[in-house]
């Protein structure tokens, strides 16, 4: 079913040319609540009915505060983003960057097909923190990438979403004994 739209369409290119309206911005800042929506994540509809799940400011703030404390994120963190920006897993890279003034590199997705080039990219950009799905990590170790190139700057590897095969996990741990691995 198509819903009618009666809002105003705004283009970034046009908005960027306008001067900021200090009064409007001040009003938003005065009236904003931590329960105000921040984003809507639309599901695929695997239950038969697609739906949007609303994430609010307080939920993201609390999540990032706790994640940052556990994984020791700070202004020196250099994230290598693997998750698409339309997927909520990207919050682990994007929001700590905003919180601390850290750095996030949006890794081109095609590099995940070429493990040696992917690790070279990590080294060129001095990426020290990755929060990736296990399949991305396993692809690097399973193809013998560490025989050619090793991530030089990693200090934190956070992973989840699937079981990390113990053989591959141990290969990562042996190759990078100084790195903190967190599931």
Give residue ranges: language-model regions.
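Conserved AMP-binding/adenylation subdomain of ANL enzymes
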Residues: 51-80, 88-128
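Short hydrophobic/charged patches on amphipathic alpha-helices used for structural packing
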Residues: 29, 116-119, 146
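Alpha-helix capping/helix-boundary segments
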Residues: 2, 135-137, 164
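Gly/Ser/Thr-rich phosphate-binding loop
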Residues: 99-102, 127-131, 141-183
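Carrier-protein-dependent adenylate-forming modules in NRPS/ANL systems
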Residues: 1-59, 71-72, 101
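Short hydrophobic "strand-cap" motifs at the C-terminus of beta-strands
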Residues: 40, 82-83, 107, 132-134, ...
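Conserved ATP-binding loop and adjacent catalytic segment of the adenylate-forming AMP-binding
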Residues: 21-27, 106-113, 130-131, 177-183
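Conserved S/T- and glycine-rich ATP-binding loop of Class I adenylate-forming
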Residues: 37, 43-46, 79, 85, ...
């Amino acid at each position: 079913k198509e819903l009618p739209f009666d809002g105003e369409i705004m283009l970034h290119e046009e908005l960027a040319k306008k001067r900021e309206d200090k009064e409007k911005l001040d009003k938003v800042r005065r009236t904003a609540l931590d329960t105000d929506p921040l984003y809507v994540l639309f599901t695929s509809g695997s239950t038969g009915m697609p739906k949007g799940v609303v994430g609010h400011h307080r939920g993201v703030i609390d999540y990032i505060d706790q994640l940052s404390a556990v994984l020791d994120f700070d202004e020196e963190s250099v994230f290598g983003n693997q998750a698409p920006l339309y997927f909520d897993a990207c919050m682990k890279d994007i929001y700590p960057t905003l919180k601390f003034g850290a750095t996030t590199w949006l890794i081109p997705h095609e590099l995940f097909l070429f493990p040696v080039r992917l690790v070279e990219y990590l080294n060129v950009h001095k990426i020290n923190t990755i929060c990736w799905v296990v399949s991305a990590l396993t692809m690097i170790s399973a193809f013998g990438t560490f025989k050619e190139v090793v991530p030089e700057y990693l200090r934190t590897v956070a992973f989840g979403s699937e079981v990390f095969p113990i053989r591959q996990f141990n290969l990562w741990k042996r190759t990078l004994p100084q790195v903190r691995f967190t599931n």
